[in-house]
C-alpha cells in the first residue's frame, strides 16, 4: 500500500503528529520534497522531538528514506542524527545519491537576496530556493558528490566561478564558495553516510511489489507550492501529492490513499495573503493557545479562522481520500467560531479562490458563525465524548471539504487523538 500525506493549508498543520500515528503500521516512511526550512514536532509522553529532515517514523525503528526531491543540508541532518543517536534511537536511514545538497554559498546567496529585497517574501534564509535553482539549472552538488573528494572537486571546478561572481555582484564574500573548512566538514559527513546511499525509487517500488506499506511524507502545505501556491510567497518545491510520485519515482497508479492534514483554524508564517487572518485578540489567543511559533525559525505564525475556500482547492490539488483535523482543542473557550465559506471580490461572491495572488489579497471572507464550546476536550477518547457544538463544527468542515475526516487531534500527544469509524 502506498499512502501520501500532505498539508492542506500553509504548512504547520500538524503533519508530524499524524505521520507519527500512521508510522506504526508502515514499513517505510519517505520524505519527498523540501529541506530543513520545514520542521515537525512529535510529542511522546513527556518528550518532544523536533525534526527537520529525518522523517517522523524514526520513533518506531522504521525504514526511513530521503528522496532526490529533497534539498539537504548535511550539517543539519548530521546534528539531527547525533541527537537521535544520543537518545538511544536506532535510525535506519537511506538517502538517494541524487539528493541535492545545500551548499554554504546557497545560504549566503539566500541571505543576500532577502536583504536586498524591497518587499520581503519571508524566506527562512536556509538556501532552499538557491539549491532548487541549481537543481533546475543542472548545476547541483548531489549527495553522491560529497562522499568522494575528487567528485566534489570536479563539480566545484565546473560551477564555482559562476557562484563566486554572483556572490560578489550581490555584495557578499565569494570565498564562501570554496571555503576549505566548510568543504572538509561536508566531506566528513558524506563519508560517514556513504553506506546510507540507496536508490529510493527502486527500494520503494520493490517494497510495493512485496505488498509492504509505504508512507510518503510531504513538507509545508498546498498553498506554499511553487506552482499552485500564493506566488511569490511560496516555497521552492512542489508540495502537493502529485510530486510524491514524481520525486520518489513511483507511478501514480500505485497510490492507494492521500491523507490531507488540516488545522481547525488556519496559520501562516511569513508574508503573503491570508484572507481570514485575525489581527486582534482572538488571533493572539489562537497563537498562544496553539503554540503557533515556527519549529524552524521560532517566528510567530499569523492565525485566522478556518478557510473552506482554500480547503476546497487543496482537495482538488491533492485528491484527498481522507482528512486528519488537528488542534480542535485550541478553539475551546471561544464563544463564537467562524468558518469562511466564500470570498467577496469586487462585489462578486467566489466559492473558489482566484489564481492571482494580488486578487486573493483583496478578497473579503464571507463567514458562517457557529456556537463554540467551553468544555475541555483534551481527554476525549471517542467522537461521542466531544461537546455537541464541537461535533457540529467538525461535521460542517467535513461537509464543506466533501472529504471524510478520519482522525481528530485534541492535543499534542499521540494518545490525544480520536479515530472516526
Swiss-Prot record:
Gene: purA
Keywords for this protein: Cytoplasm, GTP-binding, Ligase, Magnesium, Metal-binding, Nucleotide-binding, Purine biosynthesis
Protein name (record): Adenylosuccinate synthetase
Principal place of residence: cytoplasm
Record-listed IMP binding positions: 12-15, 37-40, 124, 138, 220, 235, 299
Active site: 12, 40
Sequence positions that bind Mg(2+): 12, 39
The protein's role, per its UniProt record: Plays an important role in the de novo pathway of purine nucleotide biosynthesis. Catalyzes the first committed step in the biosynthesis of AMP from IMP.
Residues binding GTP, per UniProt: 11-17, 39-41, 301, 327-329, 409-411
Lineage: Archaea, Methanobacteriati, Methanobacteriota, Stenosarchaea group, Methanomicrobia
Details of cofactor binding: Binds 1 Mg(2+) ion per subunit.
Assigned GO CC terms: cytoplasm
Subunit structure: Homodimer.
Gene Ontology terms: biological process: 'de novo' AMP biosynthetic process; IMP metabolic process
Amino acid at each position: 500500500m502506498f499512502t501520501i500525506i500532505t498539508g492542506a493549508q500553509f504548512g504547520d498543520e500538524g503533519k508530524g503528529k499524524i505521520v507519527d500515528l500512521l508510522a506504526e503500521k508502515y514499513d517505510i516512511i519517505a520524505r519527498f520534497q523540501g529541506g530543513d526550512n520545514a520542521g515537525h514536532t512529535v510529542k511522546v509522553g513527556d518528550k518532544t522531538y523536533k525534526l527537520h529532515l529525518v522523517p517522523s517514523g524514526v520513533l518506531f525503528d522504521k525504514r526511513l528514506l530521503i528522496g532526490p526531491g529533497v534539498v539537504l543540508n548535511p550539517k543539519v541532518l548530521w546534528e539531527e542524527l547525533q541527537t537521535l543517536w544520543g537518545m538511544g534511537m536506532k535510525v535506519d536511514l537511506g538517502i538517494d545519491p541524487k539528493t541535492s545538497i545545500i551548499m554554504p554559498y546557497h545560504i549566503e546567496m539566500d541571505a543576500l537576496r532577502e536583504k536586498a529585497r524591497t518587499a520581503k517574501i519571508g524566506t527562512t534564509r536556509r538556501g532552499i530556493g538557491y539549491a532548487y535553482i541549481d537543481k533546475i539549472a543542472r548545476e547541483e552538488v548531489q549527495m553522491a558528490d560529497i562522499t568522494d573528494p575528487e567528485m566534489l572537486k570536479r563539480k566545484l571546478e565546473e560551477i564555482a566561478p559562476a557562484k563566486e561572481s554572483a556572490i560578489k555582484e550581490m555584495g557578499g564574500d565569494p570565498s564562501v564558495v570554496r571555503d576549505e573548512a566548510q568543504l572538509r566538514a561536508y566531506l566528513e559527513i558524506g563519508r560517514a553516510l556513504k553506506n546510507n546511499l540507496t536508490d529510493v525509487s527502486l527500494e520503494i517500488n520493490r517494497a510495493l511489489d512485496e505488498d509492504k506499506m509505504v508512507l510518503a511524507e510531504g513538507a509545508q502545505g498546498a498553498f506554499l507550492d511553487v506552482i499552485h501556491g500564493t506566488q511569490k510567497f511560496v516555497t521552492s518545491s512542489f508540495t502537493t501529492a502529485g510530486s510524491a510520485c514524481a520525486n520518489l519515482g513511483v507511478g501514480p497508479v500505485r497510490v492507494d490513499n492521500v491523507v490531507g492534514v488540516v488545522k481547525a483554524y488556519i496559520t501562516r508564517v511569513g508574508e503573503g495573503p491570508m484572507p481570514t487572518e485575525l489581527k486582534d485578540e482572538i488571533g493572539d489567543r489562537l497563537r498562544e493557545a496553539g503554540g503557533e511559533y515556527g519549529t524552524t525559525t521560532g517566528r510567530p505564525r499569523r492565525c485566522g479562522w478556518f478557510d473552506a475556500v482554500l480547503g476546497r482547492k487543496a482537495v482538488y490539488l491533492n485528491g484527498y481520500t481522507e482528512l486528519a483535523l488537528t488542534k480542535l482543542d485550541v478553539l475551546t473557550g471561544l464563544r463564537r467560531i467562524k468558518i469562511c465559506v466564500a470570498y467577496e471580490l469586487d462585489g462578486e461572491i467566489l466559492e473558489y479562490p482566484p489564481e492571482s495572488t494580488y486578487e486573493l489579497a483583496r478578497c473579503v471572507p464571507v463567514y458562517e458563525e457557529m456556537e463554540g464550546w467551553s468544555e475541555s476536550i483534551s481527554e476525549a477518547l471517542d467522537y461521542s465524548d466531544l461537546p455537541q457544538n464541537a461535533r457540529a463544527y467538525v461535521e460542517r468542515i467535513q461537509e464543506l471539504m466533501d472529504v471524510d475526516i478520519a482522525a481528530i487531534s485534541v492535543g499534542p500527544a499521540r494518545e490525544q487523538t480520536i479515530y472516526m469509524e
